[in-house]
A protein has these predicted regions:
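P-loop NTP-binding core
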Residues: 1-272
């Protein structure tokens, strides 16, 4: 790629497959030959532990220490901060210390731009940077959206997400207007789909009817699968854990959809 793209994976609802999607799309990009960094920006540290660092609270360096160095005008030592995962992605881990920054950032000058300023030097090293946001619309998520070029929104298909989606899109719009006018919505990906239930079928139809005129709704639908949760406890991606499973094939398909969308945009930009 000619330049790095930063993608925030966000939804204030928990249990929508957000971390699983961030992890597997990021590793999917790496499997397609791209240089990828994943930033765990959730104080729960689920992405960090899902990638095999189970004792993440004991890590000496994490995303919170990076923010701390920046706030205190100290140098950020990226080499000791960034972890290397065997599946060819780099990781900036998170632990519970990050929870303190929701309050600490309140008194920081240009507080919404803190993460953006921290990762700016890393843009030259990667094709894609993924940010796994916390399940909230607080200051951490606003920081992630301010740092991002695009936001990918996982939406689970077990219930109608209308209110939650409206709130999230309002937050994205507010960040676009006031902080980051370059922010775009990458698309909506439907997750945890059980094709045997009427609620899943109804939700899929409602999401397409409600949003597809203005927002890309990806064709790929991620199925509900125990393999996905098993993979996260093994420290591996779904491709490594169960490469022939339906959920692995779905994430592979989603990754290709996102890559093809990027290639099409590059072609259109080049032809102008």
């Amino acid at each position: 790629m000619d330049k790095c793209k930063v993608i925030a994976v966000a939804n204030q609802k928990g249990g929508v497959g957000k971390t699983t999607t961030a992890l597997n799309v990021a590793i999917g990009m790496a499997r397609n030959g791209h240089d990828v960094l994943i930033i765990d920006f959730d104080p729960q540290g689920d992405l960090t532990s899902s990638l095999g660092w189970k004792t993440n609270d004991a890590l000496e360096n994490s995303v919170s220490s990076m923010l701390d160095d920046y706030i205190n005008d100290e140098s950020i030592h990226y080499d000791s901060l960034i972890l290397n995962h065997p599946e060819a992605v780099d990781v900036i881990p998170a632990n519970i210390e990050l929870a303190d920054f929701e309050m600490r950032l309140v008194s920081v000058i240009n507080r919404e731009q803190t993460l953006s300023n921290c990762i700016e030097p890393l843009r030259s090293k990667y094709d894609y940077i993924f940010i796994d946001c916390p399940p909230s619309l607080g200051m951490l998520t606003v920081n992630a959206l301010a740092a991002a070029d695009e936001v990918l929104i996982p939406v689970q298909t077990q219930y109608l997400p209308a209110k939650g989606m409206t709130k999230l899109l309002q937050t994205v719009n507010k960040v676009q207007r006031k902080i980051n006018d370059n922010l775009k919505i990458n698309g909506i990906v439907m997750t945890l789909a059980d094709s045997n239930t009427n609620i899943t079928k109804s939700t899929i139809e409602t999401i397409r009817d409600s949003f597809s005129k203005n927002i890309k709704v990806f064709d790929t639908i991620i199925p509900k699968a125990t393999k996905a949760s098993e993979a996260s406890t093994s420290g591996k991606s779904i491709y490594e854990y169960a490469k022939d499973s339906k959920v692995a094939l779905a994430y592979e398909s989603l990754t290709k959809e996102i890559l093809n969308k990027d290639k099409e945009k590059q072609r259109n930009d080049f032809s102008r």
